[in-house]
Amino acid sequence: MAWRALHPLLLLLLLFPGSQAQSKAQVLQSVAGQTLTVRCQYPPTGSLYEKKGWCKEASALVCIRLVTSSKPRTMAWTSRFTIWDDPDAGFFTVTMTDLREEDSGHYWCRIYRPSDNSVSKSVRFYLVVSPASASTQTSWTPRDLVSSQTQTQSCVPPTAGARQAPESPSTIPVPSQPQNSTLRPGPAAPIALVPVFCGLLVAKSLVLSALLVWWGDIWWKTMMELRSLDTQKATCHLQQVTDLPWTSVSSPVEREILYHTVARTKISDDDDEHTL
């Protein structure tokens, strides 16, 4: 069964000793470019830590180690392989990224004794990696990977004496970076607009300042012109008021001289008429 693109494969494998585990291989199928995640469960052991390993079978007697854990709850990785072990929960997780067709073959989940580093428990399975088709080579983002549901397959060989480990969540999101991936724009786009906004604010501030200076200059000139007109009107009015006494008021001496002149003229006229 070929898994759909963007969905990593999650397997639950129960490790146990014995020849029966060596004779059976769980068949797994995946597609090139995808990520394979295998969760190998085992019964909790004693106080001494037992290393966990992931190896690829080269022959009936040789298994090449790809990655090995070093201590509990610490991720170890080599190339495209990572491993994470949690002895308290009773499982360890192995991840293969960027699957290739040449990755097809037999693999082993193994537990090694701390004394002589020999294999104490193991499970064997066979992986088939098919070439990616045009329909599966689609762009993706980490958001798609998190939001999608991970398919789960349980591969537990039937045994009478095998003790089942406590159940744990069937889905563990494992970040991967497949080839030909296209990332969507993130928060970098708004950050790139910050200089543009700052430039607009500075330009608006400069224009506003220029308008204020221009308006202040016009207001000042207008006020000076109004003050100049008020000063000219006040000077003209004062001059008119000052000239009034000279044109409307005459002294008593002038009025007396004017009176005598008129009287003499009248008397002279009367004398002429009488002579005639």
Curated annotation (Swiss-Prot):
Example GO BP: signal transduction
Ranges annotated as biased composition (Polar residues): 138-156, 167-183
Annotated SMART domains: IG
Protein's membrane topology: Single-pass type I membrane protein
InterPro entries: Ig-like_dom, Ig-like_dom_sf, Ig-like_fold, Ig_sub, Ig_V-set, Immune_rcpt_domain
Coiled-coil residues: none
Function according to Swiss-Prot or TrEMBL: Cytotoxicity-activating receptor that may contribute to the increased efficiency of activated natural killer (NK) cells to mediate tumor cell lysis.
Subunit note: Interacts with TYROBP/DAP12. Interacts with KMT2E isoform NKp44L.
UniProt protein name: Natural cytotoxicity triggering receptor 2
Organism of provenance: Homo sapiens
